[in-house]
Amino acid sequence: GVSTRPVEKRVIDTVKWVTDNYDIDPNRVYLSGNSMGGSGALGIGLRHGDIFAAIKANVPAGIEHADQRMSFSDFKKSENLNLPDPPITLNYSGQNDGWSFGHDRFVNAMNGRKYPLYFYWGAFGHANNHERILKVNDLINSFDWLNVRKNQAYPVFTNASCNSKLPWPDNLKDKKSGQLNAFFRWRSISDTEKDFKISLFMISSDQLKTEFRIPEKATVDVSLRRLQRMNFNEGDSVKWSFGKVNGETIIGSDNIFTVKNLNLTSTPQTLSINK
């Protein structure tokens, strides 16, 4: 269900206590787990973007924990959730791993709710050994998730043209490796009440050596979360520009700024917002 359970409360209270008592930067707290721990990282971590800057699930043993805690399969219940912006989420799973069942629902929910996701897969089964998995999908460590800070805004990339086709639920025998959002990067520039700027770009083949073909350009929808000072309300009219392109976005009921069909390349361009 969606109500907080005693075990989750103990985990969060313990993390808070350690952070407070051991001089830990509260903006650089991360959560990761393998197998059952990966399921827990998703189920506990996604709800607590106020605690965790980013989370990483290695071959999670099921997505049901996250599904229930985030009400991914029950839109009605999800409307009543009042959660902070989620942590940036990394996940890698093997389509030939029985525990990976349901990742199509997980990916669709993350995409539909404009939650940040870097997702990698391949025919590596339930392995949690990086050396072994890298032989199947060499992208799993390509994003520096431990450099994410909780006190910095981030872009959410959805519906990208460069995403691989998911093998879930109907093509699990396909051994092809794949990725979602693996090549997108950003750099924060400014974040004030009236002005927000963020540089968006794709990593290039010169910067990342991989067996995957990195496209020269891609089209993607971009939403903004964890803005530190600028707030949006339903019905707000927000002017934006991205390189030579500009437009106006009306904020919807989710109170999230989204601009669709931006063209990204390895050349950084600045997304600017003015209120």
Give residue spans per PLM region.
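Residues that flank catalytic or metal-binding motifs in active/ligand-binding sites
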Residues: 51, 85-87, 218, 236
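Alpha/beta-hydrolase-fold serine-hydrolase catalytic core, especially in secreted/extracellular enzymes
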Residues: 113-118, 124-274
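Surface-exposed acidic, glycine-flexible loop patches that form ligand/cofactor-binding
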Residues: 18-25, 75-84, 229-231
